[in-house]
Amino acid sequence: MEKKLLLVVDAQKDFVYGALRNEEAIKRLPNLCNRIRNWKGLILFTQDTHHENYLETQEGKNLNIPHCIEGTDGWEICDEVKEAYKEIYGDMTLPTILKKSFGYDGWAEAQLDKLGITEIEVDGFCTDICVISQVLVLKAMYPEIKIVVKEDCCAGLNEKKHQAALEIFNSCQVEVI
């Protein structure tokens, strides 16, 4: 029996409306919300999580735009995403993984293969940073689980970088739909 997981990466206010505001993310957010509403399977969310010392970190030195600082409004999952989840699951808390870097490093403990997961769809923001990091970590950890990315449910920092990430997915045997 097929068992699917939808991993929604960093659908946070700072990536859509805030510090790293992105018109493509604004445009594609309704697609992501519809995907959540219509998903038949498990759903997990990741939440990019930084602290006040962000600009002193390696990431902050390279992307010197403070964003997703824990406890701020920009750190929160977008209201539209929460509402889409709530329509299906009621007041159940969003199952969220707080991550301190581009990719979550706890997938080994999750034992997704032992849970019978046969396919993981990874969607969200930013395609060229956190989405690609999650995809490649998952592909390395679980080479026999099918990994899929829905192009119109993701957005990069810009369209050129988004397209470049999609090309890399294809090279790494990740299905882009």
PLM regions: where:
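Catalytic-loop motifs flanking and including active-site residues across diverse enzymes
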Residues: 73, 77, 127-134
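Histidine-anchored nucleotide/phosphate-binding helix
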Residues: 32-36, 132-142
